[in-house]
Each structure stands twice: as structure tokens, then as C-alpha cells.
Amino acid sequence: MNVIPNDSEAGAASENSGYLTSSRQVWFAFAMTFALMFFDFIDRQVIVSLFPHIKSEWHLSDKQLGSLVSVVSIVVGAGGLPVALVADRMGRVKSIVVMAVTWSLATISCMFTANYSQLFMARAVVGLGETGYGSVGVALISTLFPKSSRSAALGAFYAAPSLGSVLGVVLGGMIAARWGWKAAFGVVGVPGLVLALFYLLVRDYKTVALTPDSNPANQSLGLTLKRIFGALARTHTLLWVCAGASAQLITVSAMWSWLPSYLNRFHGMTPEAAGKAAAVVVLVGALSCTLWGFVVGRLTRRQPRNKLPALSALCLVTSVIFVAAFGGTYAAAIQFKLIVVGGFFMNCTVGVVAGVAMDVVHPGVRSTGAAVLSLFQNVFGLAVGPVLAGALSDRWGLQHALTVIPLCSVLAAIFFVIAMRSYDTDAARISDVQPDAAPALADTLSTGTAA
């Protein structure tokens, strides 16, 4: 298994402006990975606009409603590392196909639940299917694209969660108003099954050995784990970036989950109208996700470490705007405009932090490194925001909860500044390591050759 491409492969990569394989294959892989992430978050977030219906029918507390969102993130985070280890050893495309089928079937099963406990368990299985998808997808995209465009590509990829959340919130409200809230799960669960079949055509990359004599396909699991976690533990930048990303996502996930309910309770909107209004905020965040990935990457081309102070500044702006929006007294229209502006800034970290993480993680363990990031983001970020806001809401009211939560963005700003100190050292350690391309899984299956 080669660490450095041979002459023909290097020439092909050069002709394709640094892409690992042909640009057409790379963009097809990107499109398919983006599409699955899009439906991943439709399935994950469709429940948010259903909160008023579920609360009314089953008489749940805000904390219980928040837990229906948080349980997905907890399971995703807890299972991300094992799944990434399997993906780094056995292939990313195979792993992604299995994930997509699992979470799609689990989403469809939610429409048959009869009480809170059943829905909670079904949502946990949705998380089980989605476990590791983001990290494995990040590893695939990061390796296929050249480093110069990595942040922009990942910024675009990470627009998918926001766009999926937008459509999930809108569809949930619309379907619930016409056919009942349970039908929403059945409608959004089917497309993922179809996309899973097409994903078999995506071309993977060959797993790169951590050292020339450590082929991961042949060595023992114990030795593999020792080498992998030893490499990650030396990457201090990754750990601080994980902390910063998680803190910012507490703010993001709380806003995603509770804004429809806030508009319903405080501005008298119907659940359907509140879902559409909240979708505007999430959509602005989705567009800004791509924009920030491009802008930050462009401005820091010569000094990549400056991505981190840029993120720090953007997180501080996020906190100030949201605290002002929910902590002050305004006319409804003015408050909503402030919330939209906050939404423009709140997704600033999403694509950029993944790019920073991939800049400093060895290509042989990128799925696992991305899984560490995903673990922090899901367990300490996405899972915390909805349930923490729900608990604060039960105690002091939803408006006060949404005023306090954005202070987590200040913590994120501090962590990103600390991460800058070790970036150059960590990036230099892996600067000369490059992976090879692998054949598409569908081609492998058709010829009967092992990947």
C-alpha cells in the first residue's frame, strides 16, 4: 500500500489540479456525499417542527421534547469512533451505504410509534444509522480535493446539514398540517434508501499506512488502535478545535431546535408558519456556511493558522447578536431580523473546523480524526444544546434560555485562539504524506475483486 503516488498517478493528479482522481469522479463523489448528508439532516431535524403537535398529544415537557433531538446526537457521537475505525480499515463507501439504509429505515419506523418511549428508541436507531457518516464523508472529501480548496469544499459540504434542516422543518410542518405529524417521518425516510444504491458508484481512496511497515489491513486490531490514537493524541490542535466546535454547536443546535417553538409561543404563529420562519434563519446559516468556508480559506491561504483567530472573532459576533436579540425588548419584526443576522454568523465554524482538523491529521486516520471531531460536536455540542435549552426553559422560560445559551460561543472563541499555538507544528508533521485513489465499489463488485 503506497504512501506516495507513483508517477502515473501523480501525473493524473497534476492534470486534475490536485484532485486525487479525475475531477468528474471527485465532483460526483462530492454530490452524492452532499445529498446523503442533506437527507441525513432532513431525517434528523424533521421532528423539530412537530414539537407543538407531539407536546399537545402526549403532554411532554420541553426537556423531553429536547431529548428527542439530543438522543440522535448522543448516539452519533458515541458510535462515531468505532464506525470510523471500521471505515479506515474496510473502506468508506461500503460503510456509508450501510449507514444510509439503516437511518432511512429507522426514520420510517418513527411513524408507527405509539408513545414517547417508542419514539425515543426509534430516534436512537436513527442516530445509530447516522453514526460516523459525517466523519467518514469528511475524510473522503478532504482526501479527494486538493488542500488549497479543502476548506471551501468542506464548507459547501457542511451547508448540507443546514439545508436539510430547513427542508426538514418546512416539510414537517406542512405534512403534519395535512396528514398528521407521524406521516412526516414516512415521507422523508424514503429518499435515503434510493441514494444509498447510487452511492455504490462512488470511488473511494486507498487507506494509507501510518508508517511504511504498518498496513492496516494486515496488522492486529490492538496495534492499529495504538498507532491511531497515538497519532491523534500528539495532534493538540485537533483537541482544541474539537472543544471550540462543540461549544459553538451548543448555540447552533439550541437555535435550530427551539426557534420554531419560540415563534409559536411568543409571536403567536401556527406551527406551520413558525417552521417556515425558522427555516429562513437556518437557510441563511446554510448559505453562510459555504460563504465562510470560502472567505476564511481565501483570506488565510498564505497563513493557514489564521483560520483559527478568524473563527474566534466570528464566534464572538454570534454571541453578541443572539444575546442582544433575545435579551432585549423589540418589535417582532426587528427581533426576527436580529435573529436572522445571528443565523448568518452562527454556522461560521462548520466547514472551516473540519478543514483545520484535516490539515493536521495523518491521511491514514482521517476518518478516525474526523470521528473524534464528530464525537465532540455531537455529544458535547449538538446533544447538549436542545436538552439544555429545554431544561432552562422549564425552569426560567424559553426566552431566557435562548438568551443564556449563546454565551457558549464565547467559550468557542477562547478555544480556537488556544488551538492556533500548535497548528504549525501539527501541520508540518504530515506535510509530505499523500494517499492513492481506489476503484469504485461498484466496479469492484462487478469484477469480484476485493477492494
Model-derived features with residue positions:
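Juxtamembrane intracellular "pre-TM" segments in multi-pass secondary transporters
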Residues: 14-22, 206-241, 266, 438-441
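Cytoplasmic membrane-interface "Motif A"-like loop-to-helix N-cap segments
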Residues: 89-100, 298-314
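C-terminal ends and interior cores of transmembrane alpha-helices
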Residues: 101-114, 316-330
